[in-house]
A protein has these predicted regions:
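Short, well-formed alpha-helical segments that are part of the catalytic scaffolds
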Residues: 12-27, 46
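Short helix-capping segments at alpha-helix termini
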Residues: 27-32, 54-59, 87
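A conserved acidic beta->alpha catalytic loop
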Residues: 40-49, 98
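Cell-envelope/extracellular polymer assembly enzymes that use nucleotide-activated donors
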Residues: 2-4, 35
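Acceptor/aglycone-binding surface of glycosyltransferases and processive sugar-polymer synthases
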Residues: 65-82, 88-90, 99-128
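Short beta-strand/turn micro-motifs composed of small residues
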Residues: 7-9, 40
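Short beta-strand/loop segment that forms part of the nucleotide-sugar
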Residues: 32-43, 63-65
Length: 128
């Protein structure tokens, strides 16, 4: 099973680094391919290049927004990117500031807590 965790970030790279460490430490016994996609919301603070080998995170990608769009737009952009460019079974959005708890990732996967939605490209139907 392929799981993508998407994390919007604006300037707080230290919290993002802490979150990645927490995610890596909390998915030890999961038998799934877990990747992280960070959405940089046009941060004004430089990101410290930190080369770290994570034992359990399969890959980390950074999507860079050209201008600051806000939290919701970052999530929407990442979801569009994941849908169009990545193979996945589940997507878990997490805040980069540590508000969301990485130890709950297992619960989402084990209990398959999901949200399903339909997207209409042109007009929303009158009867849903």
């Amino acid at each position: 099973m392929k799981i993508k965790i998407l994390v919007p970030i604006y300037n707080d790279w230290q919290s993002a680094s802490n979150l990645l460490n927490d995610i890596d430490n909390n998915i030890l016994d999961l038998d799934h391919e877990l990747s992280v996609i960070i959405v940089n919301d046009a941060s004004t603070h430089d990101r410290q290049e930190e080369q770290k080998d994570f034992k359990n995170i399969h890959s980390i990608k950074i999507l860079n927004m050209k201008i600051n769009q806000g939290h919701a737009r970052c999530i929407a952009t990442a979801l569009k990117y994941i849908f169009e460019k990545e193979e996945f079974d589940y997507v878990i959005p997490m805040d980069g500031d540590g508000e969301d708890r990485p130890e709950e990732i297992k619960e989402f996967i084990l209990f398959k807590l999901i949200c399903d939605f339909k997207r209409y490209k042109n007009n929303t139907p009158k009867n849903k």
